[in-house]
């Protein structure tokens, strides 16, 4: 079952109503969701940012981490363009992404620029927290292991099993 890409407000409701001024969009990492930003186990960064906001609107992106980063980035770019079109009084955008969320945000900027989207010029900050911009070690290990096991016909089945992994980390 595919999860739709959705923006939530800080209170966990679907984003509705008019937005003005600066908006801050937090994008979660692999195998997480929009609620992770407020979880005290992860430092409660969403709560702390909310307490320090000066008339900023905090939004939380929820997306399917099983999709490829490029597909999520393209969808996120479209979501942002729709958001700005529906809310012409937005003045600036900050994107904060954790791990895979930083990669998805960066990908959204790429596709936003490619499509000449209006929102790209509103982005003032892109903050990536622990994002593997040079690739994830786990994924590199998976490719190496798959390659080595594939060389032995009698254990190539194990190599095929290793190849079954989320598109989000390919």
Model-derived regions: residue spans:
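Alpha/beta-hydrolase fold nucleophile elbow
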Residues: 87-98
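Helical cap/lid subdomain of alpha/beta-hydrolase-fold lipid enzymes
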Residues: 110-170
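Alpha/beta-hydrolase active-site loop
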Residues: 67-87
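Short, well-ordered amphipathic alpha-helices
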Residues: 42-47, 76-83, 105-114
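Short, solvent-exposed loop/turn segments at secondary-structure junctions
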Residues: 30-32, 65-66, 102, 110, ...
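Flexible, membrane-associating and regulatory peripheral segments of lipid-active enzymes
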Residues: 1-49, 53-61, 138-141, 147
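Structural motif
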Residues: 21-23, 92-94, 125
């Amino acid at each position: 079952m595919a999860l739709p890409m959705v923006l939530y407000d800080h209170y966990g409701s679907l984003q509705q109503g008019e937005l003005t001024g600066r908006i801050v969009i937090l994008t979660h990492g692999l195998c997480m969701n929009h609620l992770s930003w407020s979880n005290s186990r992860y430092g409660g960064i969403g709560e702390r940012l909310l307490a320090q906001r000066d008339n900023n609107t905090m939004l939380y992106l929820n997306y399917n981490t099983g999709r490829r980063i490029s597909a999520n980035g393209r969808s996120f770019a479209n979501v942002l363009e729709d958001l700005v079109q529906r809310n012409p009084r937005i003045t600036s955008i900050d994107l904060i992404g954790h791990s895979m969320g930083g990669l998805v945000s960066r990908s959204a900027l790429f596709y936003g620029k490619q499509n000449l989207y209006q929102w790209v010029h509103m982005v003032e900050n892109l903050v990536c927290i622990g994002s593997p911009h040079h690739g994830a070690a786990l994924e590199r290990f998976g490719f190496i292991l798959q390659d080595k096991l594939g060389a032995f016909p009698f254990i190539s089945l194990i190599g095929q099993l290793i190849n079954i992994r989320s598109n989000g980390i390919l």
